Amino acid sequence: MDSSKIRIRLKSYDYRMLDISAAEIVETARRTGARVCGPIPLPTKIERFTVLRSPHVDKNARDQFEQRTHKRLLDILDPNDKTVDALIKLDLAAGVDVEIKL
């Protein structure tokens, strides 16, 4: 393998699925002989939305909603061809967004 590091960034709304997926990636990479740094928790992005409860009057009655995006960072150092093949074949949860940089 030409590159000496693979950087994997995981995003999800559910931190439990995110931690399970990160553990699967770490276990797969270590099984093939690569070194792993992480999972490193990145700051959680919190988006808050305020909406009126009533469609017509009573502006003081409002609801607040929030959406949290949890992120983790993994570095796989010294990957070999078996590591890349195993990571490609890995089936992660549907609610986890995976971004890979070589």
From Swiss-Prot:
A cellular component term from Gene Ontology for this protein is: ribonucleoprotein complex
Q: Which SMART domains match?
A: Ribosomal_S10
Q: Which domain of life is it from?
A: Bacteria
- UniProt KW keywords: Ribonucleoprotein, Ribosomal protein
Q: Which Pfam family is an annotated match for this chain, by its short name?
A: Ribosomal_S10
A GO molecular-function annotation: tRNA binding
Its GO biological process annotations read:
translation
This protein's record includes keyword Ribosomal protein: yes
NCBIfam families, per database record: PRK00596.1, rpsJ_bact
Self-association and partners: Part of the 30S ribosomal subunit.
Q: Give the function comment from the record.
A: Involved in the binding of tRNA to the ribosomes.
Tell me its family: Belongs to the universal ribosomal protein uS10 family.
Q: What is this protein called?
A: Small ribosomal subunit protein uS10
Species this protein is from:
Acidithiobacillus ferrooxidans (strain ATCC 23270 / DSM 14882 / CIP 104768 / NCIMB 8455) (Ferrobacillus ferrooxidans (strain ATCC 23270))
Q: What is the lineage of its organism?
A: Bacteria, Pseudomonadati, Pseudomonadota, Acidithiobacillia, Acidithiobacillales
